[in-house]
Amino acid sequence: MEEIKGYVEHIVYRNEDNGYTVFNLNNDDGDLTCVGKFHYIEEGELLELTGEYIVHKVYGTQLQVETSKVCQPEDKVSIERYLGSGAIKGVGPSLAGRIVKKFGGDTFRIIEEEPERLAEVKGISERKAREIAIQVEEKKDMREAMIYLPKYGISTTLAARIYQHYGQSVYRVIEENPYQMADHVPGVGFKTADEIASKVGIHTDSDYRIRSGIFYTLIQSVSEGHVYLLQEVLLYRASQLLDVEVQHIEKYVMDLAMEKKVVLKESDEGLRVYSAHYYYMELTVAKMLHDLNVDFDVTPSVLEHRIHMIEEQAELALDDRQREAVMEAVRHGILIVTGGPGTGKTTTINAMIHFFEEEGADILLAAPTGRAAKRMTEATGCEAQTIHRLLEVSGNPEDDDKRDKVGFGNGFGRNAENPLESDVIIIDEMSMVDLPLMKALLDAIMPGTRLIMVGDGNQLPSVGPGRVLKDMIASDCFPVVKLEKIFRQAKESDIIVNAHKINRGEPVILDNKSMDFFFLKRSDPNVIISVVITLIQKKLPKFVDASPYDIQVLTPMRKGNLGVERLNKILQQYLNPPSPQKQEKEVGDRLLREGDKVMQIKNNYQLEWEVCTKYGMTIDKGLGVFNGDMGIIKNINTYEETVTVEYDEQRQVKYPYAILDELELAYAITIHKAQGSEYPAVVIPLLQGPRQLYNRNLIYTAVTRARKCVTLVGSDSVFQEMIQNTSEQRRNTSLAERIRELA
């Protein structure tokens, strides 16, 4: 084991999540590259290191650091070097030289014990002397905290965030009530706080723990789409989480209401418990929708004439419902247009665009996902953006505090203070828009703007909380035009014809005489998987003229023989087998490999992406990768500990190893995750599953994801049963009620 002492000359690379750092160390023998994990280091610091020399095949000789210790510089040269390194704001090399010239080896004692004497140095006022002393003390305090916090399993990034919030109070917080961190520090949840509490000996029936556990249970229900829980359901779930009897925790719900963290509302179904955040979010969305829902003064005969003129100029043949949709869009501040595949939603959008362009209106088009926005652009010939990009999502960490627990909120560049400058906003795939995203969108819309929402009300609800489209329709307070006619060209597609049969609850004929809709009857899960592999590898690529990577397997479940997790492990071995040329990285019980098809499974507003030429020149860059984005792993860099993924439009994103839990293999995905996307072909393995999940909405959504070919493999009886099953997983929302209260 080598022992080396020297100065941190330059930090080449640092992974803030796990502390992995590459830096140049300057010592008596010259410069040396060092690699290892460090809680906290800065350029200019004096380190004592132990480690082993290694030879990297690309970067040459390095010191693989095992242990490190920060030393306070003792000689004049060392002190001057540290102070002038930039570690202390406002002190450069010149001023550092004057300080050390004045106080010599006694400099740090002077700073710590007699900071006012720094004013004896030319260029330092009494105020600046105090600032320098405070910074030196803060550096020392933070370094101690960055060593203390990781003992509780906290990452370096999270440790820094905790210290920035609490400062020197962090020790008291950890010892007395770590649960408060779940409320105040992004990235700390109940379970992290509970683990810390267990390590410091806080009892399981602590008031702090029970209150935090109840609130955590309520917030967790958001991931199921709920905006509230009935009190009896909340108490039962919380008691299971906390392992505490229901009667011992009931009184704490009222405590949370007194603290204004939750809102209690009586209803016919029982006492509703909302987090205050979502309760007021629903109220705000209802109020903003009410304010936008104005009528515009339009002469009917003039409007009809202008629509006919648009039809002739744009060579559009609208039916009565489509024409009605255009008229309603002109008459009202809010319009909802619904319809299944092949009913002319795109033609209707195009007619609206032509009409408003003729009027000289500014129009913005957007959709919830990148794929949906791309499809909207191709269908209209006008640029469409994701709603996030339209709202200019912020990657500033300070904006994390403005976002709610599922990652949405006010962390957008466009908002009430900086609204969108547009006369008309058209949103496609509206069924995917959840309550927080709707709130952010409405925040950025100026009074007098027309908002047109287009979607398929029979698809699955949004992944996030709420069911905005269905609640707006259910309120009966907004104009709704339902497109039902299937146009001639669409009638030639059995995908579209069968989708409408499914929607009407009619049996689908499975005789395989179709050109684009097939059912292969199999009963054994392993046989089904074998058929799926053959379809993707050999049959479908030629049939639909697409790469195997463009053919998507959709399955109802995550777990089980035909669930996402098992399918992905098997499909990975066939579609992207291991090779000496491909780097790999284990992430828990999963393996990521160069060439793998992957999906981002949560919103990350701070991840940077860039588009580069083949020569490495950056031609575009931005922030944010979002839930449902799909890409290919291009590179796994074991030296930097990063994984590079290329998404649509050649956007490349570098993931530090520490956040690889945000990526999943995507050879197979759940039907829910496929919302808003369209693929050349989909393959749907299907055997018996839970009735509440295996319903008409689910199979309808799956079938309508395919552009050229649908192939189901499995049980035809399960398929027909799903068509007849109209039960839905209940979502606790009250937006429709809030809207009606304002009408």
Short names for language-model regions:
Residues 457-623, 742:
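Conserved helicase motor core of P-loop NTPases
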Residues 627-743:
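C-terminal accessory regions
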Residues 345:
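Conserved lysine of the Walker
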Residues 1-305, 743:
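Accessory, non-ATPase domains that flank or precede helicase/AAA+ motor cores in DNA-metabolism machines
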Residues 315-331:
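N-terminal pre-P-loop "Q-motif" helix
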